[in-house]
């Protein structure tokens, strides 16, 4: 069994050694331009077209939760990957736990009005504020996949009203489910906090725009943990300036790194992190990949395969 590996920023040597230890029967090598030797599996992130084109691969593993970069390249270069080759993504590998930490900490930050107290502190103003009530602090999760379910589970502990929206209806205990475009308005109407965990597909690009924001309650909050292209930043800024949206916590942006001239940096109602909400944990990723390859070799059904038509 031959495995090729490519990631522009990861510690390649660590990954090669870890994979060799986890899959001792495999010959693992770092792919370099000009390497056309046979391979059974490819582990990649933002791979060059030539790495995958023309290969008879058993599977490709994207080294992250998103596969939009690979799918966008496939549209421009359909010869890059044969339709018969299954594409897998890292569904969790520690990312679910990180998303839980991020979402819970930020929801509690808003619920306890720490954002308001920070603004008061900036002007040396001492003023206790009325508390929010849980029953009026409904949290809506856009995107009900593996990470969305993890976030919902963690927020249930805090007894907030929860709802989710996705392409198909879910049956999560304690979570009100909405499905399809025809139910999006009803879903949004009660969301005091909107958490975005949608996949990046042509249908979801720009989905958080003026029209969507207008359907939220006045003074809602936005937490974007998915992709920057989901948000029309000018529409969000206008909503923040008007008070329609009271606050936004943004981990992802249309352009990354976020340009220094972006007005998001200095907006008093915006908090920013540099795309760190959930990062790939190498040891857990290697364990998942080695387990999945073993299942594929045995002809077993496995989780995490991407539906190329849907984009996730």
Swiss-Prot record:
CDD domains tied to this protein: GDH_like_2
One GO cellular component term noted in the UniProt record for this chain: cytosol
Catalytic activity: glycolate + NADP(+) = glyoxylate + NADPH + H(+); (R)-glycerate + NAD(+) = 3-hydroxypyruvate + NADH + H(+); (R)-glycerate + NADP(+) = 3-hydroxypyruvate + NADPH + H(+)
SUPFAM superfamilies cross-referenced by the UniProt entry: NAD(P)-binding Rossmann-fold domains (SSF51735)
Active site: 227, 275
Cross-referenced Pfam families: 2-Hacid_dh_C
UniProt subcellular location: Cytoplasm
Keyword annotations of the record: Cytoplasm, NAD, NADP, Oxidoreductase
GO molecular function: glyoxylate reductase (NADPH) activity; hydroxypyruvate reductase (NADH) activity; hydroxypyruvate reductase (NADPH) activity; NAD binding
Family indicated by similarity: Belongs to the D-isomer specific 2-hydroxyacid dehydrogenase family. GhrA subfamily.
NCBIfam families per the UniProt record, alphabetical: PRK15469.1 (NF012013)
Physiological role: Catalyzes the NADPH-dependent reduction of glyoxylate and hydroxypyruvate into glycolate and glycerate, respectively.
Record protein name field: Glyoxylate/hydroxypyruvate reductase A
Species of provenance: Escherichia coli O17:K52:H18 (strain UMN026 / ExPEC)
């Amino acid at each position: 069994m031959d495995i090729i590996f490519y990631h522009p920023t990861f510690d390649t040597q660590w990954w090669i050694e870890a994979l060799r230890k986890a899959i001792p029967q495999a010959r693992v090598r770092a792919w370099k331009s000009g390497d056309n030797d046979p391979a059974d599996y490819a582990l990649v992130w933002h791979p060059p077209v030539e790495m995958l084109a023309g290969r008879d691969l058993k599977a490709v593993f994207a080294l992250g939760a998103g596969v939009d970069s690979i799918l966008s390249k496939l549209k421009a270069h359909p010869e890059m990957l044969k339709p018969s080759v299954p594409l897998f993504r890292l569904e969790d590998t520690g990312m679910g736990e990180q998303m839980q930490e991020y979402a819970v900490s930020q929801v509690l930050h808003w619920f306890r009005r720490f954002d308001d107290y920070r603004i008061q502190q900036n002007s040396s103003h001492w003023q206790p504020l009325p508390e929010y009530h849980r029953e009026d602090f409904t949290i809506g999760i856009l995107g009900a996949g593996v990470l969305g379910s993890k976030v919902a589970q963690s927020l249930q502990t805090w007894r907030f009203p929860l709802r989710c929206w996705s392409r198909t209806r879910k049956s999560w205990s304690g979570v009100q489910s909405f499905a399809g475009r025809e139910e999006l308005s009803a879903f949004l109407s009660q969301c005091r906090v909107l958490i975005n965990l949608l996949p990046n597909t042509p249908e979801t690009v720009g989905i958080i725009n003026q029209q969507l924001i207008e359907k939220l309650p006045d003074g809602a909050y936005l937490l974007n943990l998915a992709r920057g292209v989901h948000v029309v930043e000018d529409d969000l800024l206008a909503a923040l300036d008007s008070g329609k949206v009271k606050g936004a916590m943004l981990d992802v942006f249309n352009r990354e790194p976020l340009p220094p001239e972006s007005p998001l940096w200095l907006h008093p109602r915006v908090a920013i992190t540099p795309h760190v909400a959930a990062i790939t944990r190498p040891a857990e990723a290697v364990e998942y990949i080695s387990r999945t390859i073993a299942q594929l070799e045995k002809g077993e059904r496995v989780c995490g395969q991407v539906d190329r038509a849907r984009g996730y």
